[in-house]
Amino acid sequence: MRWNNITDIAIALEEKYPDADNINLRFTDLRTWILGLDGFDGKPDGCNEKILEAIQAAWIDERD
């Protein structure tokens, strides 16, 4: 997975952190969690706020 795999990242986050408050989540924590996902091989500096917002929104949708 890389930063542009928004849906795949959201699914992986939901599987790994099913009880996390994904609405009130700091982007620094979200970035750290994504970098720690199995199968994630994106560059640590390869994201920005827009990408993190998209991942967070997809994660919220995935949970609903």
Describe every region a protein language model picked out:
Residues 1-64:
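A charge-rich, low-complexity, intrinsically flexible signal that marks solvent-exposed coils, linkers
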